[in-house]
Amino acid sequence: MQLNPSEISELLKSRIEGLGASTDVRTQGTVVSVTDGITRIHGLSDVMQGEMLEFPNNVFGVALNLERDSVGAVVLGDYTGVSEGDQVKTTGRILEVPVGPELKGRVVNTLGDAIDGKGPINTTQTDIIEKVAPGVIARRSVSQPLQTGIKAIDSMVPIGRGQRELIIGDRQTGKTAVAVDTIISQKGKGVTCVYVAIGQKASTINNVVRKLEEHGAMEYTIVVAAAASDSAAMQYMAAYAGCTMGEYFRDRGEDALIVYDDLTKQAWAYRQVSLLLRRPPGREAYPGDVFYLHSRLLERAARVNEEYVEKFTNGAVKGKTGSLTALPIIETQAGDVSAFVPTNVISITDGQIFLETDLFNAGVRPAINAGISVSRVGGAAQTKVIKKLSGGIRTDLAQYRELAAFAQFASDLDDATRRQLERGKRVVELLKQPQYQPLQVWELAVSLYAVNNGYLDDVDVAQILAFEKSLKDHLKAKHAALIQRIEDTKELSKDDEAELAAAVQDFKKHGAF
């Protein structure tokens, strides 16, 4: 077969023109060492801080230390398959997690992968876990209440939508119980909840999920679980992943609530990662940026204005404000609130609910110390009826605690002091509440009205809770319209107050409890 030279050149030209030369340019590095989930990598010259790195066998990591000769990275997930000499590639992406309404009702890990055995989550959107908090101009003041359904909190330490309220106390004082009751209380109120479990036993997380399912709360709740068996990196990043999932709803003009349970364990995990990365330790061996660790997380909880939401959604959502309310939990050691992490978080948040072991052991549950629990912005968000009725409660309690200390030594008390002590005992008893039974606004209003107006002064202390329950049943049966008005308007008009007074007096005459 004879080939013409001109044909050869034409053939080569057509082949070259038809060649698709697409290249995937990515920097590669080599693993130098692997210890406790921390890898040192040589050769990643253009890696970003916080960038996702791809290891062999579909394992991912995050670059945290950018040094002159090497990169310190944490491996997300199982690091046992990573060994010296492995090739590592940059991805050009910051760590992202899936977001959206599809996550509701599911239990996911730090990376947003389903771990509840209900199959994959069909979400199309992702977002980065580390985001800048909304600026000063984008925010609105806190003015709408977030009902926890807990008598002691809604009356004395009210929480508003967009607030950061710390729950602090020793182990086994009911911190998680307060948070879970608050989530259950959001049923039917249009609030999406995110529960982030950090460093807890898998069985404990399972119990919380089961309780949320029993009370129908999982349908509006996302659970992000970083169990004690997960790596330190997964535990420290779980809070940011959960926050991103909550921000999805805030930025679209909806209300969300996020619980971090707890930030003490997150600080421990971050300390472990930092020490393994050979960052210099400071007070209590924490790294120098442990304050920033929590401040950049909690500042993302905010109430944003209509302009922010409209701009974020490109005009799709107009005239709606969004909010993300945070309930961080801190565990103290022997009531020491002046330790490093507790003082940091107290200074960042808008108030704290302090739970005491002594009160818990004395049967006062929830074990809230009203004297040192405060809400710095929630007062502006309190419902009108509760604000009107709860004024005397805090004073009664404070005076009772003060007098009770002196009354131990005094044998002869005057009538005014004795009355004050008796009133205080009844207030303490009334504020007790079983777990998983959050109250509606009208129920709290009725209880506060009864104690403030002296209707409980002649009721035996042991019968207070039975009296309260029977009174509510009486009102449900005979004054349904009244309690519906209080629930709908969140106010107590003069006519309603007169009807309520008559109803309580009628119940006291004929009621059995």
Curated annotation (Swiss-Prot):
The keyword Membrane applies. GO terms for molecular function: ADP binding; ATP binding; proton-transporting ATP synthase activity, rotational mechanism. Produces ATP from ADP in the presence of a proton gradient across the membrane. The alpha chain is a regulatory subunit. F-type ATPases have 2 components, CF(1) - the catalytic core - and CF(0) - the membrane proton channel. CF(1) has five subunits: alpha(3), beta(3), gamma(1), delta(1), epsilon(1). CF(0) has three main subunits: a(1), b(2) and c(9-12). The alpha and beta chains form an alternating ring which encloses part of the gamma chain. CF(1) is attached to CF(0) by a central stalk formed by the gamma and epsilon chains, while a peripheral stalk is formed by the delta and b chains. GO terms for cellular component: plasma membrane; proton-transporting ATP synthase complex. Its EC number is 7.1.2.2. PROSITE patterns: ATPASE_ALPHA_BETA. NCBIfam families: atpA, PRK13343.1. The gene is atpA. The record marks 373 as: Required for activity. Disulfide bonds: none annotated. This is ATP synthase subunit alpha. It catalyses: ATP + H2O + 4 H(+)(in) = ADP + phosphate + 5 H(+)(out). Pfam families: ATP-synt_ab, ATP-synt_ab_C, ATP-synt_ab_N. PANTHER family: ATP SYNTHASE SUBUNIT ALPHA, MITOCHONDRIAL. Belongs to the ATPase alpha/beta chains family. ATP binds at residues 169-176. The lineage of its organism: Bacteria, Pseudomonadati, Pseudomonadota, Betaproteobacteria, Burkholderiales. Keywords: ATP synthesis, ATP-binding, Cell inner membrane, Cell membrane, CF(1), Hydrogen ion transport, Ion transport, Membrane, Nucleotide-binding, Translocase, Transport. It is found in: Cell inner membrane. It is an enzyme of class 7 (translocase). It comes from Bordetella pertussis (strain Tohama I / ATCC BAA-589 / NCTC 13251). It is a peripheral membrane protein.
